[in-house]
């Protein structure tokens, strides 16, 4: 039985792949669970159109990620003011990725998804300069220094 996968199936393929499987596996497992559709000429043309659209979207996503990288790395200084506990430079609490995303926006940078920000440790717990990485795309990574200042 010839099928087109609509979801990632272990040991079989990725969405959009045309696979040849035994009739029982296709009829009793893949089709009822919505993991595949029967391969017809119309379905193959539709999958090809979707694949071309995804490739075009990926190229646009890469261009957009490069623009965001230039904007983030072009920021002169990203400063975050936080309460400190005493004069030792330790913070009262910690700086999270959401705080860093807000600091980038406040510094005049683009809006960045907090899930794409990678801190040197899980949380920043002291004042000073910290290297922060932003994963914008699998091929594009922006790096900048975050200056944490006590209030």
UniProtKB/Swiss-Prot annotation:
InterPro entries the UniProt entry points to: Ribosomal_bL9, Ribosomal_bL9/RNase_H1_N, Ribosomal_bL9_bac/chp, Ribosomal_bL9_C, Ribosomal_bL9_C_sf, Ribosomal_bL9_N, Ribosomal_bL9_N_sf
Keyword field contains Kinase: no
Cellular component, GO annotation: ribonucleoprotein complex; ribosome
Gene Ontology BP annotations: translation
Pfam family, one: Ribosomal_L9_N
Keyword Cytoplasm in record: no
Highest taxon of the lineage: Bacteria
Family from the record: Belongs to the bacterial ribosomal protein bL9 family.
The protein's name in its UniProt record: Large ribosomal subunit protein bL9
Origin species: Rhodococcus erythropolis (strain PR4 / NBRC 100887)
Lineage, highest ranks first: Bacteria, Bacillati, Actinomycetota, Actinomycetes, Mycobacteriales
Gene name for this UniProt entry: rplI
């Amino acid at each position: 039985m010839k099928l087109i996968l609509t979801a990632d199936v272990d040991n079989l393929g990725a969405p959009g792949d045309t696979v040849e499987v035994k009739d029982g596996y296709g009829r009793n497992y893949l089709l009822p669970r919505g993991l595949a559709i029967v391969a017809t000429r119309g379905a193959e043309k539709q999958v090809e159109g979707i694949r071309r659209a995804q490739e075009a979207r990926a190229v646009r996503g890469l261009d957009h990620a490069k623009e965001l990288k230039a904007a983030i790395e072009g920021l002169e200084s990203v400063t975050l003011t936080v309460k400190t506990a005493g004069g030792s430079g330790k913070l009262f609490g910690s700086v999270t990725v959401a705080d860093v995303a807000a600091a980038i926006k406040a510094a005049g940078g683009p809006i960045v998804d907090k899930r794409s920000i990678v801190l040197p440790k899980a949380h920043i717990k002291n004042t000073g300069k910290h290297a922060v990485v932003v994963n914008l795309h699998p091929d594009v990574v922006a790096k900048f220094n975050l200056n944490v200042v006590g209030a």
